[in-house]
A protein has these predicted regions:
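Sec-dependent N-terminal signal peptides
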Residues: 4-12
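Central antiparallel beta-sheet cores of small beta-barrel/beta-sandwich binding domains
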Residues: 18-112
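N-terminal, Lys/Arg-enriched amphipathic/low-complexity engagement segments
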Residues: 130-179
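Short, structured beta-strand/loop micro-motifs enriched in basic residues and often containing a Trp
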Residues: 139-148, 180-187, 287-295
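Short, conserved secondary-structure segments in the cores of folded domains
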Residues: 153, 189-192, 300
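Short, well-ordered loop/turn sites that connect or cap secondary structure elements
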Residues: 157, 193-196, 304
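Glycine-rich anion/phosphate-binding loop at the beta-strand->alpha-helix junction
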Residues: 201-354, 387, 394, 401-402, ...
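A hydrophobic, small-residue-rich beta->alpha segment in the mid-to-C-terminal subdomain
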Residues: 356-402, 406-407
Length: 443
């Protein structure tokens, strides 16, 4: 099976990025450190992660998660990494200062007779900036409709920094009712996060999600995944836009022109973000902002609210964080195809967990940890959510597979988060109270 590549070199004992130490570093030939490796795949830069440790002339570590061994002689580097299927990544390079340049030969088990050779340049990951975290006021003027690594960052921030900004609604309309951009979940961002590198986890804490206008729009239809043939016939005349009044003072939303039986119908406001995303691996075409996947995206999960923390796997340097698609509230699954779509006032704080590789989006609230699965079918989404949570339990709580199965079997709570878009969403939740009793919880 062909590997999907993103490379970052990580090694214990990263030296400070001080220009005066470059010559000394080369002379001492110390390649220990975290590196981002930019590899040229036919004109497209693909990013990799590697972790190296140097002991004399011996190198060890991992390359894109695969065990690596190699040598450093003078400024010449050789390494060989092997995956579990027998594929290899063989590199030859030269080291100078904070840069490694060379070639890497990828040999895949299913194409062993046709190895691929590509040039690369690797640079040390910058160290985390010292000092007090900053709060940034950002007024968006450009909104993107793809979760792309090619989009120019609108702002560069550091781990620990906060950003206060706004989003337009799914149709591209702002808080004043002015259409700013074509619809389709246009996003605010991307925000580049210093030190975030492939193989890390980006942490996004939503400290503020507030309505900034008094109306929203939705629909009067039900999406196809939720319809049987009889209900589809009954719903054939649906699809009309329904405008809702948002009463922030009383915390309620009501249809502005209610039909006969909805004249007293009101639902509680619970502002949320439908979209929180990082740029996906550039080996794939950039997805539109209506899509979702391992990178997050249009997840439409109604527990991504004020106070929640979202965890996303980083695939490109800087992570490139996007936010958008505000909902005044939404039922499970986003059954109308649109929730109560509205613009939003947003504040978030970012952090980076170096070297932590998670398989997909996760959310944490005051009471629960939540693992998401976003796939083409509900069955596949169910499996992915379960695997995502199992990884969380084994990595963070040090459970064995047997122990994880027992916890899942007694504590799992499943929610259908999304059925409106190409990918369906399932979320597996576990109450934190259940986890407090685990022997590893305090370690």
């Amino acid at each position: 099976m062909r590997k999907v590549f993103f490379l970052l070199l990580f090694v214990p004992g990263v030296l400070q990025a001080q220009s005066g130490q470059e010559a000394a570093r080369t002379a001492n030939a110390d390649v220990s450190g975290r590196w981002v490796v930019n590899t040229d795949f036919y004109g497209t830069t693909i990013y990799f992660r590697m972790e190296l440790k140097q002991e004399g002339e011996k190198l060890s570590g991992n390359f894109d998660g695969d065990k690596l061994e190699g040598t450093l002689k003078g400024t010449s580097i050789y390494f060989l990494a092997k995956d579990e299927q027998g594929g290899t990544d063989e590199g030859k390079a030269t080291f100078q200062g904070r840069t490694i340049t060379g070639t890497v030969v990828f040999t895949h088990t299913d194409e062993a007779a046709h190895p691929e050779t590509h040039k690369f340049t690797a640079e040390l990951v910058p160290t985390r900036r010292a000092g007090t975290p900053q709060r940034h006021e950002f007024t968006p003027t450009t909104f993107y409709r793809q979760f792309s690594a090619a989009n120019k960052p609108v702002l560069t921030i550091s781990p620990g920094d906060s950003v206060h900004t706004t989003t337009v609604d799914a149709g591209g309309t702002d808080e004043k009712g002015v259409t700013r951009v074509l619809g389709g979940n246009p996003e605010t961002g991307p925000f580049s996060v210093e030190t975030a590198s492939p193989g890390d986890t980006l942490v996004v804490h939503l400290s503020r999600l507030r309505l900034n206008r008094d109306w929203a729009e939705s629909d009067d239809s039900v999406v196809g995944r939720a319809l049987d043939s009889d209900l589809a016939v009954k719903m054939k005349d649906g699809g009309k836009t329904v405008r809702w009044h948002l009463d922030a003072e009383h915390g309620l939303a009501t249809p502005e022109k209610p039909a006969e039986h909805l004249t007293r119908y009101a639902v509680p406001l619970r502002p949320m973000l439908g979209c929180v995303a990082v740029a996906p691996n550039v080996a794939q075409a950039a997805p539109g902002t209506g899509d979702s996947g391992r990178y997050g995206g249009n997840m439409d999960f109604n527990e991504i609210v004020e106070g929640a923390t979202v965890y996303l796997p980083v695939s490109v340097p800087g992570a490139l964080l996007y936010v958008g698609d505000g909902h005044a509230m939404q039922g499970d699954g986003e059954l109308n195809g649109n929730a109560l779509e509205t613009s939003m006032d947003v504040e978030f704080t970012v952090d980076v967990i170096p070297g932590k590789r998670i398989m997909g989006p996760r959310v944490e609230s005051a009471t629960h940890i939540m693992a998401m699965g976003l796939e083409g079918s509900l069955d596949d989404a169910f499996r992915t959510a379960t695997a995502n949570m199992a990884q969380w339990l084994t990595d963070e709580y040090k459970l064995t597979p047997s122990e994880a199965a027992q916890v899942l079997g007694t504590s799992a709570e499943y929610k259908v988060s999304e059925v409106a878009d190409r990918n369906a969403g399932i979320v597996l939740k576990i109450n934190k109270e259940r986890l407090k009793s685990l022997a590893s919880a305090g370690k």
